[in-house]
Amino acid sequence: MLNLRAVMELLTIEKAQDYGLTLPETGQRDQVLHDALVGYLANSRSGTRATKTKATVKASGKKPWRQKGTGRARAGYVSSPVWVGGGVVFGPQPRDFSKNIPKKIKGLALLKAFAAKVRSEEVYCLEKVEMTEIKTKKMLSLLEGWDGKESGLLILKNPSRNVLLSGRNIPHLGIVRAQDVNALDLLGFKKVFLERPAIEVLVERVKKFKREKSQNENGGTR
């Protein structure tokens, strides 16, 4: 059991509203969150399966023997698919798994994922994280009460080099900029640790999406 309340503040729905962030109800727009996660996971895939065709097999282009007079079947090249060691016909080739995720879907999914973590009481606020030297031990002291058995995501406004290097040796801990965090990042970790300056960035990202959404809706009704 985590005992984070002594050193960190639990972010509740009411406190999120104090920052100007209104969280959606549970069950609303779950399909949007699903679509975004499928897109993020698909974009992380790389098609690596590949077979060599007769054009890519390393072999001589010389005709194995003359066309007539040998009594054997005619052959033009040793990389022919009918020969052992030749190319493969219609074999698997690398494919592009990437999906285009609309900006609106990204914004809604981020809001949904953040709301889910807040309602589950898995988001904690802490003061600005600063490191004057690279020390893993000091990084752990900032997260005092976190036993490390459950994965944790530290969201910072502008993580310094010392912070990144101090945290990369800690198992199950991820560090990401508030400007770059997405729904997959939030749901991929059990606990979320939010630096207070990062909350403002996160709220501004959501507000920006809401402004664009309202402008599009108003423009569409004219």
Curated annotation (Swiss-Prot):
InterPro entries for this protein: Ribosomal_uL4, Ribosomal_uL4-like, Ribosomal_uL4_dom_sf
Quaternary data: Part of the 50S ribosomal subunit.
Keywords from the named record: Ribonucleoprotein, Ribosomal protein, RNA-binding, rRNA-binding
Function per UniProt: One of the primary rRNA binding proteins, this protein initially binds near the 5'-end of the 23S rRNA. It is important during the early stages of 50S assembly. It makes multiple contacts with different domains of the 23S rRNA in the assembled 50S subunit and ribosome.
Domain of life: Bacteria
GO biological process, one term: translation
Protein's name in the database: Large ribosomal subunit protein uL4
Family that this chain belongs to: Belongs to the universal ribosomal protein uL4 family.
Pfam families assigned: Ribosomal_L4
Gene Ontology molecular function terms on file: rRNA binding; structural constituent of ribosome
Tagged with keyword Transport: no
Keyword Cell cycle: no
GO cellular component terms attached to this protein's record: ribonucleoprotein complex; ribosome
